[in-house]
Amino acid sequence: MSIVWTNGTFDILHPGHIQLFKVARSLGDKVIVATDTDEKIKKDKGDYKPFNDLCYRVAMLEAIKYIDVVLTFGDRKELEGLIQLYSPCLLYTSDAADE
């Protein structure tokens, strides 16, 4: 089974995110999306973010038909551990979706 991985804040979902997930689905059998915790977003982007809390963002991501698994991470070490655990064949980013 080929696993495609992407991660990000996904705070305010927009059509570009949906396109990212749709293309990710076309590239593999399973799509895993990891999203930052609220604490990580505040640390990285300031106290005014995220607009939507983690529970809301996870629920929105879980409702998208192109996504199989939604995970959360609080720091880079945790993210790297999850990537190692799931061993995706492809790490897919929004930069790749623009190409």
Roles of regions detected by a PLM:
Residues 2-35:
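N-terminal catalytic cores of NTP/NDP-binding nucleotidyl/phosphoryl-transfer enzymes
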Residues 9-11, 47-50, 67-72:
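Short, flexible loop segments at the rims of nucleotide/cofactor-binding pockets, characterized by
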Residues 15-18, 54-55, 73-80:
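Structural motif corresponding to alpha-helix initiation and N-cap regions
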Residues 20, 28-64:
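Short, surface-exposed acidic-centric catalytic microdomains
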Residues 58-76:
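Short acidic amphipathic segments
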Residues 81-91:
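Proline-aspartate-enriched helix->loop->beta-strand connector
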Residues 92-97:
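Conserved small/polar residues in nucleotide/adenosyl-binding loops
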